[in-house]
């Protein structure tokens, strides 16, 4: 009889141990967002650092960072010309998500001691299946670090854009935009810039004439829309801080 009780206690203990291990695994899985490995951008970050050593950009400029929509804006020096006469630095890196900006915030942004920061992310994040709350939480952590700087910069969050290639994901992207807009409304130094609405036609669908062949990245007409959405917001707020040559 005692032998059977002992076996019963052992079985009960084993079941409890397995249940505890399963609980730990569930909690761990919930705590870790399904972010891509940031190390895939190590070479790109090192290239930026090399560029900074060879031609140090000015401090106190406006730094733009984010995924390929930000990176391709610099092709042909268009980023600088579209936002002229403001002094800008483009640190976009294609394929990135907001977690990558969070991990590499120092070499991408902080080292430049910017007076303002433009961020475009959320596009790849949603496509990667990262939950909205995780995306917004990473934005919050980035903002928290910026807020802790001796001279906290003004921050401009660009809305996640609609596209032909990712139109099926637009509801999730809109939810991210709503979250960003709500956060910006409560923060004195964050401005949400709606670059998304001008990219939709009268039927509320993505305009077909503003994308290159992949249906995801913008052509010159697409960047025209971004310029016209951003300049009226950025210039009145930033021109007075522009340093005289």
Language-model segments: residues:
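N-terminal secretory signal peptides that target proteins for export/translocation
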Residues: 1-10
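A generic hydrophobic-helix recognition signal that picks specific residues
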Residues: 15, 59-60, 212
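Serine-esterase "nucleophile elbow" of acetyl-processing enzymes
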Residues: 30-113
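Alpha-helical cap/lid subdomain in secreted, periplasmic
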Residues: 81-83, 103-244
């Amino acid at each position: 009889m005692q032998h059977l009780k002992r076996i019963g206690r052992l079985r009960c203990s084993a079941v409890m141990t397995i249940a505890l291990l399963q609980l730990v695994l569930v909690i761990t899985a919930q705590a870790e967002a399904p972010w891509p490995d940031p190390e895939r951008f190590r070479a790109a970050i090192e290239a930026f650092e090399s560029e900074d050593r060879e031609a140090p950009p000015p401090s106190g400029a406006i730094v733009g960072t984010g995924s390929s929509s930000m990176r391709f804006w610099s092709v042909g020096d268009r980023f600088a010309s579209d936002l002229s006469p403001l002094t800008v630095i483009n640190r976009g890196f294609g394929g990135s998500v907001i977690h990558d900006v969070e991990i590499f915030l120092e070499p991408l942004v902080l080292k430049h001691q910017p007076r303002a920061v433009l961020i475009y992310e959320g596009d790849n994040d949603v496509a990667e299946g990262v939950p909205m709350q995780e995306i917004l939480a990473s934005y919050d952590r980035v903002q928290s670090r910026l807020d802790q700087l001796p001279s906290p910069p003004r921050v401009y969050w660009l809305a996640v854009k609609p596209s032909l290639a990712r139109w099926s994901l637009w509801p999730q992207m809109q939810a991210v935009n709503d979250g960003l807009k709500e956060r910006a409304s409560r923060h004195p130094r964050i401005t949400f810039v709606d670059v998304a609405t001008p990219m939709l036609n009268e039927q509320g669908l993505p305009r077909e004439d503003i994308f290159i062949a992949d249906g995801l990245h913008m052509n010159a007409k697409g960047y025209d829309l971004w310029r016209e959405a951003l300049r009226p917001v950025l210039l009145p707020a930033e021109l007075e801080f522009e340093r005289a040559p």
